Amino acid sequence: MAQVKRIRRNVSGIILLDKPLGFTSNAALQKVRWLLNAEKAGHTGSLDPLATGVLPLCFGEATKFSQYLLDSDKGYETLAQLGKTTTTADAEGEVLQTREVTVGRADIEAVLPEFRGEIKQIPPMYSALKRDGQPLYKLARAGEVVEREPRSVTIARLELLAFEGDTARLAVDCSKGTYIRTLVEDIGEKLGCGAYVAELRRTQAGPFSLAQTVTLEELEAVHAEGGNEAVDRFLMPSDSGLLDWPLLQFSEHSAFYWLNGQPVRAPDAPKFGMVRVQDHNGRFIGIGEVSEDGRIAPRRLIRSE
């Protein structure tokens, strides 16, 4: 008997998941996609299986704006295990070296300023960055080590929250592309004892915080009671991650031409940058960029939601 193909639903919006421990970001995405029975889905930047916390999941029209969330600043809390280094710079790797921990709170506080502001990081071998089309982590698993260029990242906040014995809990606010594993490893080397990430929790992703998230268990419970459509109540509007952008409202006439790819003028437009756009009914219809001539050029459009 032929298997009936599941017809997926055309749903749009963002679900802020508190990613559970042990899940890859894609596995978490596919699980929530199944609960929604959503046609189109994508996430906004991977969290390691070891990590938990804020993972914005985009569905339908919201996937058009996922890159802007991917580029946003992030916040983390991490538990650094001092005295050991591992192959992966986290608890999943094999121990490479063990050293005595003779540092105290004051020693840690003294080195943290060196890692604030704009710093250079060498990406870890166990990362999704690619070399000749191959992810570095695959090369690392095969025992290969390749040269990686240092990258500039910005650490806006680096604070010692707690110190006990051989562990230090840190709060980090950082730019996109920052590797917390590398940061912790570098701090450990500066202290002379080595360190790796024992725990990692993302507390912020762009404008989104942990307080706004929903757990997988909560989604599953709602789905068990009411099916796919019951999960829709957790969907946030597609432009939720862009609320700090200037908002313009077009007339019916301007919206028509803009949705057909034509740049238009708006009296309240800023002099430059990206903007969110609503039609005359207050419906979000996409994002645009202010051109040199002052017109708003369409960049990503939503025709209906």
From Swiss-Prot:
A Pfam family it matches: TruB_C_2
UniProt xrefs under CDD domains: PseudoU_synth_EcTruB, PUA_TruB_bacterial
Domain of life of the organism encoding this protein: Bacteria
GO molecular-function terms, A-Z: RNA binding; tRNA pseudouridine(55) synthase activity
GO annotation, biological process: mRNA pseudouridine synthesis; tRNA pseudouridine synthesis
Key words, A-Z: Isomerase, tRNA processing
Keyword Isomerase applies: yes
EC number: 5.4.99.25
Catalytic activity: uridine(55) in tRNA = pseudouridine(55) in tRNA
Active-site residues per Swiss-Prot or TrEMBL entry: 48 (nucleophile)
Family affiliation: Belongs to the pseudouridine synthase TruB family. Type 1 subfamily.
Physiological role: Responsible for synthesis of pseudouridine from uracil-55 in the psi GC loop of transfer RNAs.
PANTHER family membership: PSEUDOURIDYLATE SYNTHASE TRUB1 (PTHR13767:SF2), TRNA-PSEUDOURIDINE SYNTHASE (PTHR13767)
Protein name (record): tRNA pseudouridine synthase B
Source species: Pseudomonas fluorescens (strain ATCC BAA-477 / NRRL B-23932 / Pf-5)
Phylogenetic placement of the source organism: Bacteria, Pseudomonadati, Pseudomonadota, Gammaproteobacteria, Pseudomonadales
